């Protein structure tokens, strides 16, 4: 892709947008930037030394290339108008792809992406394989280009917001963990959301690998949409070729990998994450023994079923990354019962009724916070006692005051965080600060 002299506009100046602007400028593009926020509310943007304007429809005129950040809707009217006039509109992943050296593992799914991406990178790193991890976590892809190596691997977490803007980006190993309702406030329908996730496999070529969940009907359907060799994983049935859970044993391509009890992160969904990561690592050239050793040394990713503290016999777990109903269901499945579950935040257009049965079985109460509290209360009423806690601090303190030894306070909100927090990380950090500030009960 030739960028020298190209008139480029970057839309949305958070982390990804800043990285895209820097990347374009280094390659000789004539770069401008825009955002809904004014310049003084955008850290680091003023230091870029490029023209900036607060976003209006007129700002989008006169460019050869427009790069919207992942948080900018692809169907934004000025972007649609630009495409109608032949302007190339691509995301940061597509922008970086032609310049990225080495081979790429692309990991998507509604839940488990960050854990599986981190685990895959950890396995490769522990095995001595040159690797860097980024995308939707850590480094933006454009920031990975300079450090990429011809003999290395780039392990990328890819969200639907990123996949929405790819056209030619190719993952040598593509991986879909699951596809369940999420981001319907952005993508409008589940069918559209699922189709966007599937773009990861449509750009693959013969000789690539598509690693798919044999238990997920959407993932199964992706197999017909790719030219890659399909590899399956399942925690419930035997699959071939691929990885499966047989009793308590993880089997990879017909050979014992490890015992399920050796996996240091809790939950059946994390067994599936390990199976998927093991296939990817194996196809990247890592032997069984090295994969198993790396899995044993892996530690839970922050804000993903993260143990925080035990106080007066009560455990506290931070799963702030559980921003969808399905993610919360997986979190509930990881515990036997005695749960005080904190739910709520910014609604993403999801149906919370699926939480009713597991809450009835496992929860002492649901503590509701944030903008979605009313909707959640309506949809799970009668399933479990409800507490209108309003704030995270109120929820934690109420749960601890009423919890008995052996109980667990679980933050698994099933919602986005942006009503009360800057991000799910901010929400998780706040939860941990509150929990670590609790005094023992008399």
From Swiss-Prot:
It is an enzyme of class 6 (ligase). Its main location: cytoplasm. Keywords: ATP-binding, Cell cycle, Cell division, Cell shape, Cell wall biogenesis/degradation, Cytoplasm, Ligase, Nucleotide-binding, Peptidoglycan synthesis. Pathway: Cell wall biogenesis; peptidoglycan biosynthesis. One of its GO terms (molecular function) is UDP-N-acetylmuramoylalanine-D-glutamate ligase activity. GO terms for biological process: cell division; cell wall organization; peptidoglycan biosynthetic process; regulation of cell shape. Its EC number is 6.3.2.9. GO terms for cellular component: cytoplasm. It is found in: Cytoplasm. ATP binds at residues 109-115. It catalyses: UDP-N-acetyl-alpha-D-muramoyl-L-alanine + D-glutamate + ATP = UDP-N-acetyl-alpha-D-muramoyl-L-alanyl-D-glutamate + ADP + phosphate + H(+). InterPro entries: Mur-like_cat_sf, Mur_ligase_C, Mur_ligase_C_dom_sf, Mur_ligase_cen, MurD. The keyword Cell division applies. The keyword Ligase applies. NCBIfam families: murD. Belongs to the MurCDEF family. Cell wall formation. Catalyzes the addition of glutamate to the nucleotide precursor UDP-N-acetylmuramoyl-L-alanine (UMA). This is UDP-N-acetylmuramoylalanine--D-glutamate ligase. It comes from Solibacter usitatus (strain Ellin6076).
């Amino acid at each position: 892709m030739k960028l020298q002299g190209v008139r480029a506009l970057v839309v949305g100046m958070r982390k990804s947008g800043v990285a895209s602007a820097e990347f374009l400028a280094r390659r000789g593009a004539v770069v401008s930037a825009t955002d809904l926020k004014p310049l003084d509310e955008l850290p680091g943007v003023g230091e870029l030394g490029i023209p900036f304007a607060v976003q209006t429809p007129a700002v989008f005129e006169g460019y050869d290339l427009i790069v919207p950040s992942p948080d900018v809707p692809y169907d934004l009217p000025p972007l649609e108008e630009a495409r109608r006039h032949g302007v190339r509109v691509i995301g940061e992943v597509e922008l970086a792809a032609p310049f990225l050296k080495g081979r790429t593992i692309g990991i998507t799914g509604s839940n488990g992406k960050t854990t599986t991406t981190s685990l895959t990178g950890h396995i490769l790193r522990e095995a001595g394989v040159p690797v860097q991890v980024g995308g939707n976590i850590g480094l933006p892809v454009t920031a990975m280009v300079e450090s990429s190596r011809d003999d290395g691997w780039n392990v990328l977490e890819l969200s639907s917001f990123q996949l929405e803007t790819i056209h030619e980006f190719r993952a040598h190993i593509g991986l879909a963990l699951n596809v369940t309702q999420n981001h319907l406030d952005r993508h409008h329908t589940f069918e559209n959301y699922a189709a966007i996730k599937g773009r990861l496999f449509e750009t693959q070529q013969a000789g690539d690998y598509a690693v798919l969940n044999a238990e997920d009907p959407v993932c199964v359907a992706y197999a017909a949409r790719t030219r890659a060799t399909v590899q399956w994983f399942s925690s419930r049935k035997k699959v071939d070729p691929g990885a499966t859970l047989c009793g308590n044993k993880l089997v990879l391509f017909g050979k014992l990998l490890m015992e399920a009890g050796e996996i240091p992160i809790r939950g059946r969904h994390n067994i599936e994450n390990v199976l998927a990561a093991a296939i990817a690592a194996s196809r990247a050239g890592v032997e069984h023994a090295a994969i198993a050793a790396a899995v044993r040394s892996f530690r839970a990713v922050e804000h993903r079923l993260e143990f925080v503290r035990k106080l007066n016999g009560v455990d506290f777990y931070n799963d702030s990354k559980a921003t969808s109903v399905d993610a919360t269901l997986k979190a509930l499945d990881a515990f036997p019962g005695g749960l005080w579950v904190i739910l709520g935040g910014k609604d993403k257009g999801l149906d919370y009724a699926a939480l009713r049965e597991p809450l009835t079985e496992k929860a002492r109460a649901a503590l509701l916070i944030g903008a979605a509290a009313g909707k959640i209360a309506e949809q799970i009423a009668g399933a479990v006692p409800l507490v209108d806690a309003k704030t995270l601090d109120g929820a934690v303190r109420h749960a601890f005051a009423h919890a008995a030894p052996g109980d667990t306070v679980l933050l698994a909100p099933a919602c986005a965080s942006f009503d009360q927090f800057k991000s799910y990380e901010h929400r998780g950090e706040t939860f941990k600060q509150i929990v670590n500030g609790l005094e023992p009960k008399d």
